[in-house]
């Protein structure tokens, strides 16, 4: 509420507009923005580079990638996994050697204590004139003194073990964060599921005008059509890829034509349900397109 007096208003109420303005300027609080059409990728763009694909490939979850970009991503992830695994093995060896040193030091301490105990044994002469009562009293006194000694030693050891930040020798030390064993599988950057190079499906888009080259095709808004019905493809048209041929068809064509015979119209191969892969589209910018159009950024919160 620091900017309330600087705003062009004489009202005593902290308005919603001022609150949003202060939230954006202060750097505190969760900030949310409603995304528009320009913030949504097209259906034929790579999910990594957000650029139209030259050599598109599709995952089994329906995410479209540029082949070069996704191969570079897989290679980078494998190198990162190798680095993490190397660091984990190094930590494992360090913990193992530390455990061996601790066990050796404990054995050495036990041996030293045993030697001291053996050297401190002194046989006292038995006095024949002492009565059993005095022996019992002596035993009781000895047990009491030993118990008090044990209690005092236990208290002193527990008090010495307490961490004290004002004493340099008793200052608690922060233990290093232990690394977890990294997973060796490369995951998809969009879905998070395991990703393999052999699972990528080559996609063949049917251009709207075959006479145009790629540069001229990219300047148009309507670039590709369905391989069967020749309907224009876009973010507002649900479409799918047929695994055997890799062609892109509309979901309307799949429901009305292809699912009747379950045959690929291009190659003539038999199709299964898993061979029809819907493409994950970016949406149209409208709320009813099925895409979350609200971006949120969680920032520190000022609490009273």
From Swiss-Prot:
Gene3D superfamilies: Zinc/RING finger domain, C3HC4 (zinc finger)
Keywords: Cytoplasm, Developmental protein, Nucleus, Transferase, Ubl conjugation pathway
Top-level EC class: transferase
Compositionally biased residues, Low complexity: 143-160
Pfam assignment, any one: zf-NOSIP
Domain of life: Eukaryota
Ranges where the record places region Disordered: 94-165
GO molecular function: ubiquitin protein ligase activity
Record's protein name: Nitric oxide synthase-interacting protein
Gene: nosip
């Amino acid at each position: 509420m620091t900017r309330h007096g600087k705003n062009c208003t004489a009202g005593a109420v902290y308005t919603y507009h001022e609150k949003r303005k202060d939230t954006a300027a202060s750097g505190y609080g969760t900030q949310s923005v409603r995304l528009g059409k320009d913030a949504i990728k097209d259906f034929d763009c790579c999910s990594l580079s957000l650029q139209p694909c030259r050599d598109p490939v599709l995952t089994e979850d329906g995410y479209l990638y540029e082949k070069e970009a996704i191969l570079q991503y897989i290679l980078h992830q494998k190198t990162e996994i190798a680095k993490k695994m190397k660091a984990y093995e190094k930590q494992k060896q360090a913990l193992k050697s530390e455990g061996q040193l601790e066990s050796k030091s404990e054995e050495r301490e036990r041996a030293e204590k045993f030697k001291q105990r053996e050297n401190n044994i002194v046989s006292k002469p038995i006095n024949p004139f002492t009565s059993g009562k005095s022996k019992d009293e002596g035993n009781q006194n000895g047990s009491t003194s030993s118990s008090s000694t044990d209690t005092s030693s236990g208290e002193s050891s527990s008090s010495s073990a307490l961490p004290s930040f004002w004493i340099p020798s008793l200052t608690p030390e922060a233990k290093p964060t232990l690394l977890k064993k990294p997973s060796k599988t490369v995951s998809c950057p969009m879905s998070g599921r395991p990703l393999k190079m052999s699972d990528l499906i080559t996609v063949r888009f049917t251009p709207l005008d075959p006479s145009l080259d790629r540069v001229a095709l990219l300047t148009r808004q309507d670039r590709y059509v369905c391989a069967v019905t020749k309907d224009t493809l876009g973010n507002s048209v649900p479409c799918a890829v047929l695994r055997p041929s890799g062609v892109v068809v509309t979901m309307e064509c799949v429901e009305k034509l292809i699912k009747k015979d379950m045959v690929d119209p291009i190659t003539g191969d038999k199709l299964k349900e898993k061979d029809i892969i819907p493409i994950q589209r970016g949406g149209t910018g409208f709320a009813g397109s099925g895409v979350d159009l609200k971006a949120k950024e969680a920032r520190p919160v000022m609490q009273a």
